[in-house]
Amino acid sequence: MLSRIVTCFLFLLSSLPLFAEEEAAQSKNTFVQPAVMLAIAILFFYFILWRPEQKRRKAMEKRKNDLAKGDKVTAMGIIGTVDDIREHTVILNIASGKVEVLKGAISEILKPNDNKS
């Protein structure tokens, strides 16, 4: 069984140069097709992945900068009301206590008409 596997493997290895020579003879424009595929991939990543994420990030950053006392926010799954805003942190009222949270940890700013319980 092992000898059959080794024989098949050696046969495939010995025939690889034949496939390579045949491919080189068939295609003369080897630069155009990969360049087009690369351009399509770059456009896909830009318009489908990177650009929408950049827009969401800018919108959330603007909302974080516009935070005001009394806004309801979620930070790491905790829902609280903004009590005080500092340079890099926010003080949240949660139940009967206060918690200091980094502005970057705020994941969502709830609108007054949101009913999330």
Curated annotation (Swiss-Prot):
Please give the name of this protein. Sec translocon accessory complex subunit YajC
GO-annotated biological processes: protein transport
Main location per UniProt?
membrane
Q: How does it assemble?
A: Part of the SecDF-YidC-YajC translocase complex. The SecDF-YidC-YajC translocase forms a supercomplex with SecYEG, called the holo-translocon (HTL).
Superkingdom is: Bacteria
SMART domains given in the database record: YajC (SM01323)
Q: Its GO CC terms? A: plasma membrane
Family per UniProt?
Answer: Belongs to the YajC family.
**Topology in membrane:** Single-pass membrane protein
Bilayer-crossing regions: 30-50
Q: Which lineage?
A: Bacteria, Pseudomonadati, Chlamydiota, Chlamydiia, Chlamydiales
- Give one Pfam family, short name only: YajC
Q: Where in the cell is it found?
A: Cell inner membrane
UniProt lists the gene as: yajC
Protein function: The SecYEG-SecDF-YajC-YidC holo-translocon (HTL) protein secretase/insertase is a supercomplex required for protein secretion, insertion of proteins into membranes, and assembly of membrane protein complexes. While the SecYEG complex is essential for assembly of a number of proteins and complexes, the SecDF-YajC-YidC subcomplex facilitates these functions.
- Per the UniProt record, the source organism is Chlamydia pneumoniae (Chlamydophila pneumoniae)
Q: Note the SS bond partners.
A: none
Q: Which UniProt keywords apply?
A: Cell inner membrane, Cell membrane, Membrane, Protein transport, Translocation, Transmembrane, Transmembrane helix, Transport
